[in-house]
């Protein structure tokens, strides 16, 4: 049984979820949000992200990281900060010996909902169904 840590990185908050998989069956373990200190410069925020992810890794011992590939953003500053957060998250996982898997947003939506053009709400709805979470 493999344990997978999924991360949706951001410079203000980072979402995460942990599942266990066996074959095509996925079982929900935990999820949450890492809130970063927005009153701090980006460097200390990345430090909080890195150490918070290390705590999650210590507790749940994931084998793999699933993270969305970089996409083009309209705001270059926001894209740069997102890239920093992705880098901190990936570094924390690689530092702990995890395998890193990057997926395009369309690929994730296609796998979860059946269409690469699915909305966030459609993805959220299907994740609840697939992991048997309360509505």
Describe these PLM feature segments.
Residues 1-135:
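Phosphate- and other anionic-substrate recognition elements at nucleic-acid/protein interfaces
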